[in-house]
Amino acid sequence: QWGDEGKGKIVDLLTDRVKYVVRYQGGRGAGHTLILNGEKTVLRLIPSGILRDNVTCLIGNGVVLSPAALMQEMSELENRGVNVRDRLLISEACPLILPYHVAMDHAREARWAKRPIRATGRGIGPAYEDKVARRGLRVGDLFDRAAFAEKLKNILDYYNFQLVNYYKVEPVDYQKTLDDVFAVADIITGMVADITTILDTARKNGDNILFEGAQGTMLDIDHGTYPYVTSSNTAGGVASGSGFGPRNLDYVLGIIKAY
């Protein structure tokens, strides 16, 4: 139960029956492989329901969101004729994964090569660290660019000090990071919505909602094979990662490897 159980495939099979598919934890490390009309698609951040025209996809506050990864995934889907922007909604409370998170991930794995955590190198762990430390930048910060630029400068000073002085690697460039984020900021903020309210309204309307986990149960930060785990709660993160009341969940489907 450390991944590759077929979660993405089962989600894809169930999406014909639902109106919403929700990602509530993890980052761009899901790696859900889907086959639709004979074409293979790998989704790492965007919910698997995006391939179904009848489904609205939601990214909840528990997901750490990489602007670069989101743009790449959107581009790949749109090039294949998938309507993403009108059917994907994002919580403003999603922490952002930025280049310094990725740099820190790689620096740590190199430093502790003899006993690595086997991180994906995508900055997911460091982004969750920033969230817990209450210093991270979030999607909602993109609405105020002046404030975002100031916050980015402060946090990048913090990261670059560690990268240069402890890990002995190159610092992350502030201006490039800022320019790259601002280049896609309008696209991201255009998809921001109140995910909790949408889910509550859907529940009251009797709409079917499917919550899509990104990792297996044994990778749960609290209940998995610590320390070789991910940085979030897997099944248990549904409520806190989306704002959906836990008592409103009426069915849980677990996917188990047969070998």
Curated annotation (Swiss-Prot):
The lineage of its organism: Bacteria, Pseudomonadati, Pseudomonadota, Gammaproteobacteria, Pasteurellales. Belongs to the adenylosuccinate synthetase family. IMP binds at residues 4-7, 120, 134, 215, 230. GTP binds at residues 3-9, 31-33. It is found in: Cytoplasm. It comes from the Bacteria. GO terms for cellular component: cytoplasm. It is an enzyme of class 6 (ligase). Pathway: Purine metabolism; AMP biosynthesis via de novo pathway; AMP from IMP: step 1/2. Its cofactor is Mg(2+). Plays an important role in the de novo pathway of purine nucleotide biosynthesis. Catalyzes the first committed step in the biosynthesis of AMP from IMP. PROSITE patterns: ADENYLOSUCCIN_SYN_1, ADENYLOSUCCIN_SYN_2. Coiled coil: none annotated. SMART domains: Adenylsucc_synt. Its EC number is 6.3.4.4. GO terms for molecular function: adenylosuccinate synthase activity; GTP binding; metal ion binding. This is Adenylosuccinate synthetase.
